[in-house]
Amino acid sequence: MIQQESRLKVADNSGAREILTIKVLGGSGRKFAGVGDMIVATVKQAIPGGNVKKGDVIKAVIVRTVSDVRRADGSYINFDENAAVIVKDDKSPVGTRIFGPVARELRDNDYMRIVSLAPEVL
């Protein structure tokens, strides 16, 4: 589960390396976010020449979490790290590549562009 002040790895080539969660979007007083949820974050580490700079306030969608995600068939999936992809307001990614696997739950939340760019969907 991702909450305010959580730090996440960025799984795309937008130029950011690490982000810090400012707010979980979707409802008043919502505390936690899981795979497929949108967050507002700030860039904490960035590489030179990237599309985003350190200190930028961005929106991102969570693609991997360490905590378990329960599926409809009763199975669970988790990952080794918490990771997100920086997106625009229309849910399209800022970067042109996605690194690492992403969860299948993104397909249910209409992030088809992220799913199509990902090398593996679990």
Curated annotation (Swiss-Prot):
GO terms for cellular component: cytosolic large ribosomal subunit
Keywords, ordered alphabetically: Ribonucleoprotein, Ribosomal protein, RNA-binding, rRNA-binding
SMART domains, per the entry: Ribosomal_L14
GO MF term set: large ribosomal subunit rRNA binding; structural constituent of ribosome
Residue ranges of coiled coil: none
One of the GO biological process terms: translation
Pfam family, one: Ribosomal_L14
Disulfide cysteine pairs (residue numbers): none
Domain of life of the native organism: Bacteria
InterPro entries attached to this UniProt entry: Ribosomal_uL14, Ribosomal_uL14_bac-type, Ribosomal_uL14_CS, Ribosomal_uL14_sf
Family: Belongs to the universal ribosomal protein uL14 family.
Subunit structure: Part of the 50S ribosomal subunit. Forms a cluster with proteins L3 and L19. In the 70S ribosome, L14 and L19 interact and together make contacts with the 16S rRNA in bridges B5 and B8.
Known function: Binds to 23S rRNA. Forms part of two intersubunit bridges in the 70S ribosome.
Protein name: Large ribosomal subunit protein uL14
Source organism of the structure: Leuconostoc mesenteroides subsp. mesenteroides (strain ATCC 8293 / DSM 20343 / BCRC 11652 / CCM 1803 / JCM 6124 / NCDO 523 / NBRC 100496 / NCIMB 8023 / NCTC 12954 / NRRL B-1118 / 37Y)
Gene behind the chain: rplN
